[in-house]
């Protein structure tokens, strides 16, 4: 009987620990997404001023904070494309599409990227 009670107590303890772990992870994720969003917004602001390297830095930071943030990868791809780094642009577009395959903006940007590279015969943009 004591063994059964001990096992039930341990099971409840494990359930509580699991729930607490899940709940504590949620705010951390929300904070990471919020911080990533701030980096993306700042990146947009500096890109509009022509500061593309700073924008790349900000969008890279956003992807580090939240590796699931497809829009950050899309913006990063645009910046790499602008800077002429077509290999990195392609990689960033592909990552964005893997994260959000049905996002029409990302699909449109990727399709335009491919079309331009096909038309100009650039091999590094595939």
Q: Which residues are covered by each model-predicted region?
A:
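Register position in tetratricopeptide repeats
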Residues: 48-49, 82, 112-119
């Amino acid at each position: 009987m004591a063994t059964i009670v001990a096992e039930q107590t341990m099971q409840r303890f494990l359930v509580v620990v699991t729930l607490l772990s899940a709940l504590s992870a949620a705010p951390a994720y929300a904070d990471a997404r919020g911080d990533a969003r701030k980096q993306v917004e700042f990146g947009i602001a500096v890109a509009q001023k022509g500061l593309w390297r700073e924008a790349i830095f900000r969008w890279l930071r956003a992807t580090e904070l939240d590796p699931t943030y497809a829009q950050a990868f899309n913006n990063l791809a645009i910046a790499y494309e602008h800077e002429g780094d077509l290999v990195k642009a392609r990689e960033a577009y592909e990552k964005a599409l893997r994260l959000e395959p049905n996002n029409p903006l990302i699909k449109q940007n990727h399709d335009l990227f491919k079309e331009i590279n096909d038309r100009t015969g650039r091999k590094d943009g595939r």
